[in-house]
Amino acid sequence: MPIDMNALGAETPWTQVTVTQRQIDSLCSCLEDYNPLFLDEEISQQSSNGGVVAPPTFINCFRDFKTTLVLSETEVDLPLLLHGEQVIHYYKPVRPGDTIWHKIKVVDAGRKKSKTYGELNFFTVLIKLKNDADEKLVEATQLFFVRDK
């Protein structure tokens, strides 16, 4: 299924979410990552972080938001979607109590050759997270391939 090339440049509005310790606890439980820097205020206060921080993979909690943009704008069938690559640049830690603003944009689309699947459609999204002070927290790109039916 070809990607709707009109999706190139499509983006979501800035949307906010407040990070809670409960969200961080849930993610750590799912990952079976019990690092005290993510879970224990007393221990994490003694670290260079100066308090509890969210695990780096916390940004993936915004996946539903991303999927909505991708599926509606690119007109891709979810079962045909393959994760290609992900590059994440971290600028500041995400902490419980932070209000995070996030935005996603389709920045590239086209066709590429794959060793396994032959020629595939692809698209890349840019994910931006910032805090209430307009400080950049995270920028990430994710490449997705779309198998032909």
Predicted regions and their residues:
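Short acidic (Asp/Glu) patches
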Residues: L81-Y90, V107-A109
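HotDog/MaoC-like acyl-thioester-processing domains
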Residues: M1-M5, P93-K149
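Hot-dog-fold acyl-thioester-processing enzymes
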Residues: M1-E85
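Residues in well-ordered beta-strands of folded domains
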Residues: N60-C61, H89, L143-F145
